[in-house]
């Protein structure tokens, strides 16, 4: 059996391509996927999937001591005609279709929520306005569950907006019927003390297209785990993300794309900027191409821009291949400091230093902001980036 090839890419960045390697995505998990929280040991920080996460700042989400208190979050759904919005109990058969919890917090969330929101777009419905889901924290502890399901050949855009203060653990499911097209923009714009841990599962149908744009700015600790699986051949998934990690913040994005069926595609691109003492960003990109997934075409990329001293990035792409019959596979990861030469060039053209810094950072994020496709959201994010940079001057 071949050994994994390790490809170092900087002091805080590493990657590997494993061809039939002994260490796989499955063996790096502390327990098999399960809906039962009792099947997962309490993490202590030495486990592979928890080694970057500051457990002491999770406010008890990881060890079962976090209990629902008062008003945790308020969820409001604004949906155009052709969309059904329901509040259901945990026995609803539509829950759990897209995937199973893979860690203790996700299982705790699944075991603890009282009501779930189910948003359904009828087959062949093509929405001209986005579905907007507002999740507003009200200072308490909450466990949530949401399902967005598209029928065959339906098309929709969903914006999930997280604001306020909360300690929230949740599961979000995306179920795409054959030929469906779904774009999801998930914005984490929490207050500075918020804690948010979530698992996002997408099940992509035959010839369906799923695009996810994850945007993370606020919060004390934010840990998101998007996961993709394919229900049939021909599915495509695009996972884009941008994050701006400020002093003292911990932002962690852990992705897993499971190419479990033939002739599917995936494209991952995440970019982050960091500034301030003890700003910490973590990006884990796991892509598994199973033996049955012939014809797979996949690529993942992570780029990080460190704006000040005292910030840290951990970036780990992993690509595991169990068949040689693929269309293409690759990954790239790089972390670098602010380009002084580029800054000098702009300043030599008469642009003030502060404005030059803004131009460079805006250019760094531009291609991902444009993936959103909603002018009001794009303008808001550009304004947030500007505000972050103003605070650092």
Regions found by a protein language model. Name each.
Residues 2-115, 126-127, 131, 270, ...:
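N-terminal amphipathic, basic helical "cap/leader" segment at the start of enzyme domains
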Residues 4, 96-351, 361, 365, ...:
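Conserved beta-strand/loop scaffold segments within soluble protein domains that form the structured core
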Residues 28-31, 39-41, 299-300, 340, ...:
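Generic hydrophobic-segment detector
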Residues 50, 359-360:
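Residue-level "edge-of-site" marker
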């Amino acid at each position: 059996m071949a050994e994994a090839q390790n490809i170092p890419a900087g002091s805080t960045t590493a990657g590997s391509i494993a061809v039939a390697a002994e260490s796989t995505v499955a063996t790096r998990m502390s327990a098999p996927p399960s809906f039962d929280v009792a099947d997962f040991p309490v993490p202590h920080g030495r486990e592979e999937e928890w080694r970057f996460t500051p457990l002491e700042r999770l406010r008890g989400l990881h060890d079962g001591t976090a209990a629902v208190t008062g008003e945790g979050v308020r969820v409001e759904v604004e949906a155009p005609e052709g969309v059904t919005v329901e509040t259901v109990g945990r026995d609803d058969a539509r829950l759990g279709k897209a995937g199973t919890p893979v860690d203790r917090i996700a299982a705790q969330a699944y075991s603890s929520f009282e009501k779930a929101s189910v948003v359904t777009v009828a087959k062949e419905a093509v929405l001209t306005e986005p579905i907007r889901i507002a999740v507003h924290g009200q200072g308490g502890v909450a466990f949530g569950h949401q399902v967005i399901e598209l029928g065959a050949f339906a098309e929709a855009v969903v914006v999930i907006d997280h604001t306020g203060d909360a300690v929230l653990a949740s599961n979000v499911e995306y179920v795409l019927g054959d030929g469906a097209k779904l774009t999801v923009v998930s914005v984490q714009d929490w207050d500075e003390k918020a804690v948010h841990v979530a698992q996002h599962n997408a099940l992509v149908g035959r010839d369906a297209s799923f695009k996810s744009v994850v945007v993370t700015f606020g919060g004390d600790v934010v840990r998101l785990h998007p996961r993709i699986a394919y229900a049939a051949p021909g599915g495509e998934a695009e996972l884009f993300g941008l994050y701006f990690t400020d002093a003292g913040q911990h932002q962690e994005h852990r992705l897993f794309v499971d190419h479990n069926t033939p002739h599917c595609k995936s494209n991952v691109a995440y970019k982050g900027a960091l500034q301030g003492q003890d700003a910490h960003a973590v990006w884990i990109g796991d892509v598994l191409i199973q033996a049955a997934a012939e014809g797979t075409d996949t690529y993942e990329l992570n780029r990080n821009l460190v704006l000040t001293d005292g910030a840290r990035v951990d970036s780990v792409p992993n690509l595991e291949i169990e068949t040689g019959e693929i269309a293409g596979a690759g990954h790239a990861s790089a972390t670098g400091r602010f380009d002084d030469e580029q800054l000098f060039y702009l300043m030599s053209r008469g642009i003030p230093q502060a404005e030059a810094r803004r131009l460079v950072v805006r250019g760094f994020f531009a291609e991902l902001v444009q993936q959103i496709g909603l002018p009001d959201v794009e303008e808001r994010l550009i304004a947030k980036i500007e505000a972050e940079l103003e605070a650092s001057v």
